Structures are given as C-alpha cells and as structure tokens.
C-alpha cells in the first residue's frame, strides 16, 4: 500500500493538508483514512512516521486527535499494547497519545489503558 516514495512525501503532504484552518484534505488524508479502515497495520506505520516528523506540538495534536484516535477507536484492542509500550519510552508519542479523546467511540478498557499510558486533559468535544 505504501511504498518508499510515499513514506518520503506522505508526512509533508499530510501536514500540509492539516495546517490550514480549516484543513484542506487531499490524497494523504484519504490514504490514511483508507488504511485505518482496511489495513490498520499500514496505518499504524504511517501514524508513527507522522509522530516522528511532526514539525511542532500542534501537529502532534492533529495526529492524536485525527488518525491515532480513529485507529484506536476502530482497532483499539489490537493496538493499545503497542501504544502503551511506545508511550512508555517516547515523549513525542506520549504527547500525541494525550491528545486522543474518543471516550464515546472507544472501548472502555482501551480508553482506560490509553489514559494511563498518556495522561492529559480529556473531555468530550463540543
């Protein structure tokens, strides 16, 4: 699904789509949305690339509140242990994970584990 060329240009394109207010979604957002639905392991890899290459804390928030939240809501039991392990040793990932809300869409056990792995101000979005 994602070749080396995409891995190189994907983060730049994705952050470029999410930077405007409101965001202007294009191929990178769509690619990740499809991956979350159909190829969650590929989506996980792309999310980790985004966390690594996020240019600032706001961008980490976009990743957390967007694709990471969607992945954990749709496939949380598969990915929560991976998220816990990475959050334990990676401050950037932990900060990104702290931006995930999703309590009304996520399995309660997954949500509790996520909150323990990355405490942060959470609530329901208006």
Language-model regions, residue ranges each:
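Alpha-helical solenoid scaffolds in large eukaryotic transport, assembly, and signaling factors
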Residues: 2-115
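Low-complexity intrinsically disordered segments
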Residues: 118-126
